[in-house]
Amino acid sequence: MRTRGAWLSPERRGADRVVERPPALPDAARAPFPRVFFATQDRSGPLIWRCLWPAAALVRQGYYVAHGRLQNPRSAQNAVGTDAIVFNRMSWLGTELPQGEAFIAEQHRQGRVLLFEMDDDLISIDCREQLHLLGAQEGLSPGEVDDAILRRLESIHRLDGVTVTTEHLAGVVRGLTDTPVAVVPNAIDWAWFQDVSLGAPRQDRRLTIGWAGGRRLEADTAPLAEAWRRVARRYPHVAFKVAGYQAPDLLAAVPEAQRIAARWEPLDRYARAYAGIDIGCCPLADTPFNRCKTPVKAYEYAAMDAAVVASPTVYAAALGPDKFGLLADTADAWEDALCRLIEDQALRFTLAARWAKRVRERHSLPGQAGAWPRAWANLIGAARARLGLRRGPPLVAHGMYRG
C-alpha cells in the first residue's frame, strides 16, 4: 500500500503542506494563441474542475487564461487582449438579451469569440426534476428554473461555441442547437488535491465508508442508504462519512455513533471534506441528467487513496468490472461490494492503488491540460472563418451579466 502523498514531487512533501498560490498571468501580447478569459459568477464545485484547475495548469505552461467577473472592472480588465471570453455556466435572462446581443456584436467587431462552458445538462427539459431541486437551493421556483433553462439555451444559440465534458453531453447540446460543440474531458489537479487534503489530518481511525456530493434526488442514494443500514448493523466498528450535502436518507441509515458529518469546505480547501474516507461511494440513478455526468467523484477518491464502489451509470466505462473498482446498482449489490472491501483488505488496497495510478496517469493535470487550448483554437478558428472576424482593438464592455 502506498502512503498518501507518494505521488507528490519532493518539494510538495514539505512539512507544512502549503498549497502554492495561483501563478501570475503572462503578458497577453506575448502569450501563445488562444488567449482566453473565463467569465464566472458562482463559487461552486464545477468552477474548480472547469475553470480554476485548468486555468492554473495552462498559465504554468505559458498560456494566458484569466478568470473573474465581467461586472467587476478590475477583473474584467484581464479580458483585454484575449481571443475569446468563455461564459462558465452563465446566461442572460430574458430582459437582458438585448444587452447581450449588443455585447456579442461589439466583441465580434473586435474579433473576439464568445463561448459557453457547461459540465451538466442545464438545457434539457428532460432534466427539469433535478434542475428544480438545484434551483430550490437558490430560492428559485420551478417556473423560474424552467425559464432559466430556456434563457440559457437562447444564450447558447447566440454564442459561437460550447465546451462540454463528455460526448454524451455533446450529443444533447447538438440535438438542441446548431452552435458548434467541443468536448474537453474533466481532469483532476492531482497534486493540489493531495496537498489540500493532507492539511486535514485524519481524526477518526476507524475504517470509513464515505459519500460526498451536492443535493440530489433520493433515487440516487436510496439503494446506497439501504446498504449502509445493513452494513452498519453487520460491522459496528465501521464509520460512515457524509460530506457536503447532508443527504437525509444516508444520515438516517447509520447509528449516530458510526456517523461522521462534514460540510463542504471553501473552494481553496475543498479537498478536506474527503479526509479519512477509505471506501468511496459513487451512486447515480440512470436518469437523463446523470448520464451527462463524469466520474469525477471517483477521481477525487483516487487522490485520497480510497477504493471505489460506484453505480454502472457513468462509472462502468471508467472502472471496468472489478479492475479499478466495484460496481453496484441495487441495495443487495451495494451491500455485497462494501462487505467485500471491508473483509478483504488486500483487495481494497489493490483496487485503490490501481485506480490511483490510472487517474494520475490518464485523468490528471497538467498532463491533460492541452485539451483546452486545442478545443478553444478549433472553436475560435471556425467562428472567425464563419463570421469573417478579424482581430481588432481589444475593448471590453461591463455590467450586463447574471448567472
PLM regions: where:
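Donor nucleotide-sugar binding/catalytic pocket of nucleotide-sugar-dependent glycosyltransferases
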Residues: H157-R174, D178-D195
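Nucleotide-sugar-dependent
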Residues: S124, R216-A219, W264-A303, V309-L319
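A charged, aromatic-enriched C-terminal amphipathic alpha-helix characteristic of glycosyltransferases
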Residues: A346-G381, G392
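Conserved acidic donor-binding segment of nucleotide-sugar-dependent glycosyltransferases
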Residues: P321-D332, R340-A346
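N-terminal pre-catalytic "stem/leader" segment of glycosyltransferase-like enzymes
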Residues: R2-W92, R128-E129
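Acceptor-binding helix/loop patch of EC 2.4 sugar-transfer enzymes
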Residues: F116-I149, Q194-D195, D204-R205, A383
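Conserved catalytic-core segment of nucleotide-activated headgroup transferases in glycan assembly
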Residues: F37-A57, Q61-Y63, N186-D195, G199-G276
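Membrane-proximal helix-turn-helix segments that form the acceptor-binding/catalytic region
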Residues: R69, F103-R109, G139-G161
